[in-house]
Regions:
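Conserved beta-strand-loop-beta-strand element in the redox core of flavoprotein oxidoreductases
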Residues: 1-14, 20
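Fold-independent oxyanion-binding glycine-rich loops
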Residues: 5-6, 23-25, 38, 52-53, ...
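Flavin (primarily FAD) cofactor-binding/catalytic cores of flavoenzymes
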Residues: 8, 56, 118
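FAD-site-proximal beta/loop scaffold in flavoenzymes
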Residues: 15-88
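Internal hydrophobic alpha-helix adjacent to the cofactor/substrate pocket in enzyme cavities
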Residues: 75-98, 125-126, 180, 184
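Flexible, glycine-rich terminal cap/loop adjacent to redox cofactors
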Residues: 89, 105-184
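Flexible, acidic loop-helix segments that line cofactor/substrate-binding pockets
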Residues: 93-109
Length: 184
């Protein structure tokens, strides 16, 4: 497959690739739920807006999962369900989506957690990155997994890790370590 690219740093000639990952995404069905009959507001894209305790604009109605927004991941929805149940039971819990791991189960795996560079820019965070090629890791070489890399995104002022990505065999299994670094 040959791909032509655009942009300041784009190569002038089409580039050859052996494989392409196509991802089309998902669409919420908030408009199909007739949530408006209960007074629940649905935005133009079909999402139901909630607060940090998963309450909708109708205080006794909660919403969780794909219908409340990105990322549309099952483990996020399960955690939101736990938070909503705890709030309904009278506890003062809330949902903090800062560390939600995402993994594309491709070969090699592509995994990320925390803020991306784009999100850091949008939030006005001054950041730096550090990248480690797996070809420099004896363990990766010995495991025949040297085709990969780990990238960390950290706050330039505090030096705290705010995000990271891993591309490589079983990269998703290492993602928890970056998530832990973000939360510490």
């Amino acid at each position: 497959i040959y791909v032509s690219m655009e942009g300041k740093k784009a190569p002038s000639e089409p580039q050859r690739y052996d494989a392409v990952l196509g991802a089309i995404g998902r669409v919420p069905n908030g408009k199909n739920l007739d949530a408006g009959k209960a007074g629940v507001e649905v935005d133009d894209r079909g999402f139901i807006r909630v607060d940090k305790q998963l309450r909708t604009n109708v205080p006794h109605i909660f919403a969780i999962g794909d219908i409340v927004g990105q990322p549309m991941l099952a483990h996020k929805g399960v955690h939101e369900g736990h938070v909503a149940a705890e709030v309904i039971a009278g506890m003062k819990h809330y949902f903090d989506p800062k560390v939600i791991p995402s993994i594309a189960y491709t070969e090699p795996e592509v995994a990320w957690v925390g803020l991306t560079e784009k999100e850091a820019k949008e939030k006005g965070i001054s950041y730096e990155t550090a990248t480690f090629p797996w070809a420099a890791s004896g363990r990766a070489i010995a495991s025949d997994c040297a085709d990969g890399m780990t990238k960390l995104i950290f706050d330039k002022e505090t030096h705290r890790v705010i995000g990271g990505a891993i591309v490589g065999t079983n990269g998703g299994e290492l993602l928890g370590e970056i998530g832990l670094a973000i939360e510490m």
